[in-house]
Design a protein with these regions (language model features):
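Flexible glycan-contacting loops in extracellular carbohydrate-active proteins
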Residues: 57, 179-209
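Solvent-exposed segments in extracellular or luminal domains encompassing
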Residues: 272-287, 371
Length: 409
């Protein structure tokens, strides 16, 4: 049986691939081995309050807060970002079946009292399944951003950024809300940053797990935010096309789930495995349900994968489609790479090359499915017009298809 391995691009293009953002990283708490230690080397520290436990996290372990007095207190250089400077705060949050716990749960806050004086906070509201964050200097200068969370996810990757007067909220690497204040908000105060501890009498303590907490003295952009997006509890394969009779292996991100269930089960080698081999016979949307059965109340995550199945006997090699423009460096899957639109129609591939306007070759494909990311020798190329040349055989005859494309940035 032939198996197509689907390699997933998890990092950015060219020289940026695989880099972790360390510029202006002021504090980083991975919570690895159940330790509250600043791995940035900048010397922030903290204290664990209550009997906070550690559970499975997105990398190693995360701190679990049971909503009954568990909390963290953080001090040190990380507090310096909460002044008038630009900043970013990013972390992973896993919610649980919280039963009777309702109201506004304080995920984290740097706030002396229940007022708007020099305050920063991030809250989760269970009733509306909403994450929100506020910054305020006083009762006339403040702003709040908020977004609903995906009810089919257990882990959520949350990032807030402040750039001058603009305050933004990203969920799973996607901008969900952004507001502009009438002036830059000064957050300077001596209050420590507290995690999972209520500020106001109507607040509830946070009930869930936190992991991979980072503080930056800069406003990260969307690409930088996504370099830390581990996509927990997701199917990493992109929606794809395969030949009838072929198979592929499903790949899921690291997960803390105890049970897996694929539906439909037809063509799935093991419907209870995280990474089964799938052999579809018709276009199918596969749904993976990941179940947490630990003592935190449990949780369900769901993700889907669309697989189109093509019978090679129905393809016409005389009709090959190639786009005329693309935008490398944009969000993955949004016209960010260039290649043959229907590569399965090229059943006897010879070569596919791209040239700059001086005739220099900047890309040579290994097969019909290869795609160009807009780089040459690891460096992004300038916007402009490029030429392509596809050489292949169709019905036993050699064919040459040429044209131009525009690289946009």
């Amino acid at each position: 049986m032939r198996i197509f391995s689907l390699f997933i691009l998890l990092s950015l293009h060219c020289s940026l691939t695989g880099q972790v953002i360390s510029e202006k990283l002021e504090a980083y708490f991975s919570f690895q081995d159940c330790k509250l230690f600043d791995q940035s080397g900048n010397g922030s520290s903290g204290a664990i309050l209550g009997d906070t436990n550690c559970l499975c996290g997105v990398r190693d372990t995360g701190f679990y807060f049971d909503g009954s007095g568990d909390a963290l207190l953080l001090v040190g250089p990380l507090a310096d970002i909460f002044t008038t400077s630009d900043f970013s705060v990013g972390f992973y949050m896993r919610l649980t079946d919280q039963g009777a716990i309702g109201g506004s749960q304080v995920v984290m806050a740097k706030q002396a009292n229940c007022n708007l004086q020099d305050a920063f906070s991030i809250r989760y509201t269970q009733k509306t399944n909403t994450i929100s964050s506020s910054i305020s200097e006083n009762d006339t200068l403040f702003t709040t951003v908020q977004a609903k969370l995906n009810p089919n996810q257990c882990w959520h990757y949350i990032t807030v950024t402040r750039s001058n007067t603009r305050y933004s909220l990203y969920v799973n690497g996607v901008l969900r809300d952004s507001k502009t204040s009438k002036a830059r908000i000064d957050l300077t105060s001596t209050s420590p940053l507290k995690i999972a501890e209520p500020v106001c009498t109507i607040d509830q303590p946070f009930h869930g797990t936190l992991d991979e907490l980072r503080f930056y003295s800069k406003a990260l952009n969307e690409d930088e935010i996504n370099r830390h997006n581990l996509r927990p509890d997701e199917i990493l394969n992109s929606d794809t096309l395969i030949y009838l009779g072929n198979s592929f292996q499903a790949i899921t991100a690291q997960s803390c789930a105890q049970e897996y269930s694929w539906s439909p089960t037809t063509g799935v080698s093991d419907p209870t495995a995280s990474n089964p081999v799938i052999t579809p016979t018709a276009p199918t949307i596969y749904i993976l349900t990941m179940t947490y059965t630990d003592d935190t109340g449990g949780c369900l995550s769901r993700d889907s994968l669309m697989v189109n199945v093509i019978d090679p006997d129905t393809l016409d090699c005389n009709k090959i489609f190639i786009p005329n423009a693309f935008t490398p460096g944009s969000s993955a899957g949004r016209n960010d790479v260039f290649g043959i639109s229907n590569p399965f129609a090229v059943n006897d591939f010879i070569s596919f090359e791209i040239f700059d306007r001086w005739g220099g070759r900047v890309f040579a494909a290994e097969d019909a499915k290869s795609q160009w990311d807009g780089c040459a020798q690891g460096q992004p190329l300038n916007p402009g017009v490029y030429l392509y040349r596809l050489h292949y055989r169709c019905d036993g005859k050699e064919r040459l298809k040429t044209g131009s494309l525009t690289l946009l940035r």
